[in-house]
Structure formats: structure tokens, C-alpha cells
Amino acid sequence: MKFNLGSLNKQKKLREMLIYCFLETTAWWLIISRFTGANPLSSLTTRTVSLMTFSLISAFLIAFIMDTNFSSNLILPIGIIGLIPIILDIEKLTFPIFGLLLLLIIGLFASCIPQLQLQNYFGLLTISLLVVAVVPITIYYGQYHYFPNALFTSFIAFWFLTAFFLEPYFTKKTQSISITSIVLLGATVVAIFFLSHIFLAFVSVILLLVSWYAKPLLLKSHWWLIIFGILQIIISFAL
């Protein structure tokens, strides 16, 4: 019996992208739910549906860009599709929110243009910040029409965590022992312990350390982004 390794690898990539898409979207909305103590999905308005649709497509786009090594011709079409529900509901979302969401898509697309040279440490930190902040900010602003500065503090742990997990895609360093990986790991661990729920902080750190140790295997087996999504949800509950 012959196994088509190429087909098997594509299936693993698709599995990783779809699961991460669900986990990332859940984490984005959970951050706001935990911060406010309210369910942002309690009232299903057209604005909520538009933001949820954008969240799902954006999360898929992030995983798609990473798993295709920033080089697929489908990146721009997927980004445009993600903006369609926002454009159709732009009157209810307001122009500033549309501009912020557009910034995420532009940032992701720009990271794929070799001439811009964003596949480096600057690009890593910039894209990680956009991935962490844009959707939660728009969800909160869309619900309450203002944005509290205190929410930025909760983004710090997620920013370092995102940079840690996206680092191998931007730097092409898949080994666990590298200066960048260790620095981001240390920064993430410190930021996590500033969260309010100590037990979940410990659980997050243990899973993070195991992920760091098994980094080459998780990347090769396409579990890396899935672990990333799971960790975000755990840390969301620690807020």
C-alpha cells in the first residue's frame, strides 16, 4: 500500500488552519467577554454577525499565510472576501472601525510582499500586535462605542504569546534553542504571571514550556498553531 505523503501533509495543514480559525476567533471574543463580564454575542445584530464573519475569515487568513509560507496567490482574494461583510454593514460599524479592520488585512497582505521586507523581527512584532488587538478592539468599540485603556494591559501577554508562536514563520528558525525564541518565551512567561488567575497562569506556562520544547515536532506535524489557539483561550480565562 502506498501513501501519498503530499496529500497527507495538505490534510494536516487544512486541519491546522480550520481548528486554529475556530480557536483564534473564540479567543478574540472571549477576551472581550472576560474583560467586560458580559457576552458580546448576547444580541445577534447585523453588526455582530459582520464582525463574527470577519473574525473567522481573518483567523483563517492568518493560518493560511503561515502554512503557505507567505507565498500563495489566494491570500489577497481571501482578505477581500473577509472585508465584504464589513463593507456591506459599514454604516453600522462606523468608518474608524472599518479602517482598523482594513489595517489588519493590509498588514497581513503587506507581510507577504518580499519588497517590503516584513518577514523579520519588525514584521513579527507589528503583525503580532495587529493580530492580537484589532478584532478585540473593534468588538469592544462596536458594543460600547468607546475603548478603555485598561484593555491594552491585557493585550501584553497575548502580544508576546503571538510573537512567540509566529516567530518560526517570520524568522524561519524552527529549532527550540534560539535567542529570539528564548527571549520571547521569557517575556511571555513574565507577562502571563501578571494575570489575575494564578492557577491558570501556571497551567499556561507549563503548556507553553512543553510547546517550546516540542517546537520542531509540533511545527512538522502541523499542531503548532492549534496549541497557540488553545493557549490563548486558557490565558483568556486567566484575565
Which role fits each region the language model picked out?
Residues 26-48, 83-99, 133-153, 189-200, ...:
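Helix-coil boundary and interhelical linker segments in multi-pass alpha-helical membrane proteins
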Residues 42-43, 72-74, 93-101, 119-123, ...:
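Short, aromatic-rich membrane-interface segments at the entry and exit
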Residues 76-141:
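Intramembrane alpha-helical segments
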Residues 5-19, 63-76, 110-129, 170-183, ...:
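Interhelical loop and helix-boundary elements at the membrane-water interface
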Residues 1-101:
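N-terminal topogenic module of multi-pass integral membrane proteins
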Residues 26-29, 168, 182-239:
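C-terminal transmembrane-bundle signature of multipass membrane proteins
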Residues 50-61, 102-114, 131-133, 154-166, ...:
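Alpha-helical transmembrane segments and their membrane-interface exit regions
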Residues 127-177:
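Functional transmembrane core segments of multi-pass inner-membrane proteins
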